[in-house]
């Protein structure tokens, strides 16, 4: 009798490591999507035990690694072997049981750019919030944050300062990844503006870089919550003689300006809240002022990317928000008495310039 534990045939690939048949594609789905929770928990172990750091200064035997992290050798070997298969680490084929870093694992070391993302997205709090994902789809509304003792995602920061720091560091990673594309865009010119306000700008990295590139901008303002701007890690705050950091709440008021930028802000909020945010900004906009929105624009005609759909579910579960198509963005702007002036095509993350009607 089959115990249910027998091993099905795993994906077969050709010489180029390409999955070739429907069966192989289905089995690959098992190894990625269906078993995703296992990947997440395994990666959580690697992050907690700083294994990427341990291998940074050279190859280590399994005994050296296990002694360092306080894990028995058999378990440690199976953990590292798992991630050799996922190309995070490599094993010396001439000396089995000796492991070394890869260029990928370096990115997740303490000095690596992706370390904050690796820690945050496998964090116990993050994992706990996603246990109720089936209920979210059944109800059309997420109560995920209640499982971690808060009514709204943003309240987590007061209760869990370490998670808040990880969030801020993760936002810095996203901003760094987008900066070169934004600053090199031929479709945007900030030289025409006297004051530029980055709403929800975290620690001012984007607006700071714009001030470096555009000396004609007289004043840059980084506007975010007090808990973000005055976070425990002040080393993240960007410093520039023309940059001011102002704490506040964009549901209440924002600084007056002739240009606003918002990067991945509105996708954090349900439509009715997005309308409130835009109407708050509207009250402070100088004549002919513009808002540059850096947001994902889903285009069904081009097909759905894994990144866009992943972020959409992330927003759904954590903050009851979503990613939007261009038509959905236009509907939102209409509700807030704004108009879409243009889409900036050479911004990979998506960029829309809007103004008041």
From Swiss-Prot:
Pfam families associated with the record: Dimerisation, Methyltransf_2
UniProt GO BP: biosynthetic process; methylation
Keyword S-adenosyl-L-methionine: yes
InterPro entries membership: COMT-like, O_MeTrfase_dom, Plant_O-MeTrfase_dimerisation, SAM-dependent_MTases_sf, WH-like_DNA-bd_sf, WH_DNA-bd_sf
Enzyme class, broadest EC rank: transferase
Substrates-to-products reaction catalysed: (3,5-dichloro-2,4,6-trihydroxyphenyl)hexan-1-one + S-adenosyl-L-methionine = 1-(3,5-dichloro-2,6-dihydroxy-4-methoxyphenyl)hexan-1-one + S-adenosyl-L-homocysteine + H(+)
Keywords: Methyltransferase, S-adenosyl-L-methionine, Transferase
Top-rank taxon, per record: Eukaryota
Positions of S-adenosyl-L-methionine binding: 200, 224, 249-250, 263
The EC number(s) this enzyme carries: 2.1.1.-
Active-site annotation: 267
GO molecular function: 3,5-dichloro-THPH methyl transferase activity; O-methyltransferase activity; protein dimerization activity; S-adenosylmethionine-dependent methyltransferase activity
Keyword Signal: no
Recorded family membership: Belongs to the class I-like SAM-binding methyltransferase superfamily. Cation-independent O-methyltransferase family. COMT subfamily.
Protein name: O-methyltransferase 9
Lineage: Eukaryota, Amoebozoa, Evosea, Eumycetozoa, Dictyostelia
